[in-house]
Amino acid sequence: PCTSTTNMAQSTHKRKAANGHLGITEESRMLNSILIKMVSEIDTELRTGLRFVFTIEQPKSADVTEIPALKMLTEREDVYRAEFSMCWFGVPYQKHTYIWTNIKPLADALNQRRCSKDNPCAYFNRHEQVKGNSDECTPFPPQLCALIKDHVACHVSKRRFEPYCLPCA
């Protein structure tokens, strides 16, 4: 369902302000219901589960941050949105991507990996074009997976010996 938010798919899914950025297709509705459930669970865990960490990835598009469920996440002070380019992680295409997380060092590390003239990746000025079906761009590059894994492991290991208790009401 993530493809319902990509720039290439907007002529089909039509996530526009006029429909509250919810889109018009069954795929859009499916992603919306997944996001609503996921954000509800994340919100509950962030309020009650002190040892909870998460990441949500979505392709960057003009209006993806306006999808109501993702907008709710962005408005939280303990959630950080990172914007980065997949080409920084060893793939030849420049897929601009968002990740929402509650691990600030991860968001900071990802934000440093936006491909541009001032911050070029190894493929700068010779990125491969993705036309039509974007399925080949869907898998996370191993370097990105390793970065996320390292930050999650570091974050949870620092908290391993903290006493676990719920916040006072």
Predicted regions and their residues:
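Conserved active-site and SAM-binding loop architecture
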Residues: 1-169
